[in-house]
Amino acid sequence: MNGLSKHEVEYRKNNGLSNNDNIKYTRSPKEIILSNVITLFNILNIALAVLVLTTGSIQNITFVSTIIFNTIIAIYQELKAKKILDNIKVTKGDKVTVVREGNKIEIPKEEIVLDDLVYLSSGDSVLVDLEVLKSSSLEVDESVITGESDAIIKRKDDKIMSGSIITSGSGYAKVISIGRNSYANKLVSEASSIKDESSYLQTTINNILKIVTIMIVPVGVLLFITQYFKSGQTYNEAILGTVAGVIGMIPEGLVLLTSVALTAGVIKMAKQNVIIQKLHGIEVLACTDILCLDKTGTITDGTMEVEDEVILNKKINLEEILANINTEESNNATDIALKNKYGVKNTLKVTDRVPFSSAKKCSITEIEGTRYYLGALEYISDKKITDYKELTPYIEKGNRIITLSRGKKEEIEVLAFIIIKDNIRESAKDTLKYFKQQGVDIKIISGDNPITVSNILKSLEFDGHEKHIEGKDLPEDEKELIRVAKETVVFGRMTPKQKQLVIKALKEDSTVAMIGDGVNDILGLKEADCGIALGTGVSAAKSASEVVLTTSDFSVLPEIVNEGRRVVNNIKRVASMYLIKTTYSLLLSLLSIILTYEYPFYPIQLSLISSICVGIPSFFLALEPNYTKVEKDFIVKVFRNALPNGITVVLNIFIVIMFCSVFNQNFESYRLVIVTLTGFITLRLLYTICKPLNLWRKILLVFCSISFFELLILLPDLFLVSKFDIVSIVFITLLGFVDTYIIDFIEELYDKVVQKVRGWKNERKEKNKLA
C-alpha cells in the first residue's frame, strides 16, 4: 500500500480538502479593536459630543474622555487575554501515521487530507473518519461515541468514526471525512442549536440596556423640545441640558466594568491552563447548582493498578507466568496495570500468542506446551465469579477481576484472580468536598457499571453514593425523569442521548455544568448551561464547550468557580452605583418634559460624579475577592440600592427648584447644592457597599470623598457651579441629614413590595404544581 503521492496531497490541500475545522478560539486584533470601538454607546456618545461642540462649551465634552479611556482599557484587556490564550494549545499535538509514496510518516492532524492512507496500531486515537482497507485483528474502543465500553472488531470496509481509540491489532484505513464533515464535528453542528449562550448577568444587563436604548431617542427629542421651545432656554442651554439627560441615562460604565471584570477572570484562568472559550462560561460556573462529571479523568486519573491477588493454586509462580504473558505492545489500561505490577520477561519459552479480543474476552498464551488464558472467567470456563466466596468483597466494591487459567477448553484449571482497581486522583476527595460545602450537587454520569462508580464514591466518603441507576432503567415520562434525575447521584451505562436527557431534566430549576472529553459527551456538553472539556479529550468536545481544562486537572475547578463568583458578586455589588444615575436621569428627564423646567445638570457635572464617585471606586471593588455563592437576584439587589437613592436625588432637586421658585432665587446659584447632594448620596451608597470596612476600603472611600469635594471647592468655574457659602453649606447639611431617613424609608417600602411579589409568585407556583 503506497498511499497518496506528493502531487495528490498538494492538490487536495489547494482545494480545501485538508483536516482543518476552522475553529477560532480567539478573535483577530482587528476584530477586537473594531468590536470595542464601533458600539452603539460609542456612536451615541460621539453624536452627543458633536452636539455639545456646536454650543462652544468644550468643558462639557469631558464625558468623551471617559468613553475613550473605557474603550482603550477594554481593547487592552482583550488583546492581553488573546495573547495568553493563543500561547496555550488546546489540542496537545495530536499526530497520526500516514502512508505516502510507500513511506510511513507521522504528521499533525491538521495536515491529514481526504483519501490519505492511515496506519493504525494499538493505542492510536482516531482523529478523522476512516474506512478500513486491511485489518490485522483490529479492535476499536468506541465508548466515547456510543458509551459502550466493549471493544469492536473492525474488518475490511468497516467504518471507524473520529473519537474512537484503537485497543488492539493493527491495520490500514482510508480517510473518508475530515474537518467539519467528520462525525465528531457534525455532532457539534447538530447540537449547536440546543443552548442559549447568554448568561443570567448578561441577559439582565442587556435587558436594562434595551429599555434605556428604546427610551433615549424619544425622551431626548422631547427634552430638547421642552427646553428650547417651552422653557424659553437658548439653543446652547437646551442642548447642554438634553445631552446631560441622555448621558445620565446610559450606564456605559456598567457594560465596560462587566466586560473588563470577565476578561480579567479569563486572563487569570489562562495562567492556570484553563481556557474560557466563551466569556459567559465563567459566570455560569459561578452560578452552578449541579455539576455532572464522568468517573474517568475526574475522580479517577484514567489509569489502573493491581490491588490484590487471590491465588487458588499455591504451587504456581504467578509473577513469572504473568511477566511472560505480558508484552510491550499491549497498551490498554488493564495491560499497563499488569505490566507495572509484574513486568515483562522472556524467561519462559512462549510458543504462541493470541491477543485479547472483545469476542473471546481473553488472551491466550502458550508457554512450554501449556495454554494460559487471561481474561473474564465466564468466557474461559463454565464457572462464574460469584461461585468464589473469597471474591465477594471485591465484587461488592465493583473491582475489575481478571482470571488466570490453564489447560484445554474442556479441562480448564483456574489458577488465580488478579484484582484491578481504578487509581483515584489525590485531589478528588478535597474537590468533591469543596463542592458539597458550596452547595453544589455532584452527579456522576458514566458509561461504566454504576456499582463500580458507587463504590469509588464510597471510598471517598461521598454522601449519596448508594443512589445509582442504569441508563436502561431511566423512566420515559418527563416528570418522572426529572424526579429521578434530582434524587439519583450515580448514572451508569449511559448513552449520549440519555446523558443529554438527564442534563435537560436537571436544568428544570437549576444551573448545570458538565465535564466531558468524548464524542459521546458532546450532546451533554451542549445541553448543559456550561460545558467543560478536558484537554486530553477529542477536539469536537473542546469546541462544544465553554471551558477547556488544558491539563485535564479536575482540581482547578474550585479556582474557576471562585473566580466566577468574584466577578459576578462584585459586578452585582457595584452595578447599583451606575444605575442610580440612570434612575435619577430618567426621572428628571420625564419631570422636565412634564413640568417644563430646565434640566438641572450640565454634562460636566455628571462626568465628575460618574468618574470620582462611581467609576474609580467600582473599578477597584470589582477586583476584590468575593467567593460567596451567587444568587439569581441581580435585579432585586441592584434596584434595592439604585431606586431609593435615585428617587432621593430627584426629591432633593425638586425641593431646591421649589425653594428657588417660592423665594424667587436664581436656580444657577443652587446648582452647587444639587451637585454636592447627588455626590453625597452616591458616596453614601459607596460606603454601604464597602461594608464591612477594611483598611483598603477605608482608603478608597476617603480618597473618593476628598477628591470630589476638593474638585468642587478648587474648580467651581470648570464644573459650572458657584462657590461654597454659608447658605449652601446649611442647605446641603439639612437636606443631607433628611436624605438618610428618606433612603431608609424607601428601602423598607421596597423590601415589603418585593416580599409581597415573591409570596404571590410562590403561591402561583404551588397552584401550578397542584394543577
Where are these regions (language model features)?
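Cytosolic catalytic regions of P-type ion-transporting ATPases
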Residues: 62, 93-206, 400-403, 476-485, ...
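Transmembrane helix-loop-helix hairpins at the membrane interface
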Residues: 19-97, 104, 338
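Actuator/coupling domain of P-type ATPases
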Residues: 2-28, 69-72, 80-83, 87-91, ...
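Membrane-embedded transport module
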Residues: 344, 464-513, 518, 528, ...
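Cytosolic catalytic headpieces and adjacent flexible linkers of membrane translocases
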Residues: 221, 225, 363-385, 390-505, ...
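Cytosolic catalytic regions of ATP/NTP-dependent phosphoryl-transfer enzymes
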Residues: 164, 287-414, 420, 433-434, ...
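Hydrophobic alpha-helical transmembrane segments
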Residues: 55, 59-93, 100, 198-290, ...
